[in-house]
Design a protein with these regions (language model features):
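HotDog/MaoC-like acyl-thioester-processing domains
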Residues: 64-129
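Hot-dog-fold acyl-thioester-processing enzymes
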Residues: 1-53, 114-129
Length: 129
């Protein structure tokens, strides 16, 4: 469904016979926007509603198929406060299947630096991801 919702009509994401016979894989597999959505959800569930994703890049190393158990992991690699006073966390994230990293990701997320701060209120020169 993720492929269709993102208008990715490539049959390898929703036509099992095509994926197996034409691409030589065991089944359909999740597409790029679906991978991005999983990481974004993982980060924002962790940071809470005031966490604001600034940047994200990821690399898909192997496909994730229906029925695969995805295990998410992550660590904070850097904490920084920029010149505008925004608190940034650099994250190293991964989705693993059967103990192997299927997709690795680096993300930069803003979090409140104190109870009065809200990264969602930052604009223009105060928002520099």
């Amino acid at each position: 469904l993720g492929a269709l919702a993102s208008r990715d009509w490539r049959p390898l994401h929703h036509d099992r016979e095509f994926a197996i016979n034409r691409n030589g894989v065991k089944d359909i597999f999740i597409n790029t926007p679906n991978n991005a959505a999983w990481f974004e959800r993982y980060v924002t569930d962790w940071t809470g509603p005031k966490g604001r994703l600034g940047r994200m890049k990821f690399r898909m190393n192997q496909p994730v198929f229906p029925g695969d158990e995805m295990v998410f992991s992550g660590r904070v690699s850097r904490i920084d406060v920029d010149e505008a006073g925004c608190c940034w966390l650099d994250l190293d994230l991964a989705i693993s299947v059967e103990g192997k990293v299927a997709t690795s990701c680096q993300a930069r997320v803003a979090i409140p630096r104190d109870a009065a701060d809200n990264p969602w209120q930052r604009k223009n020169e105060h928002w520099k991801p």
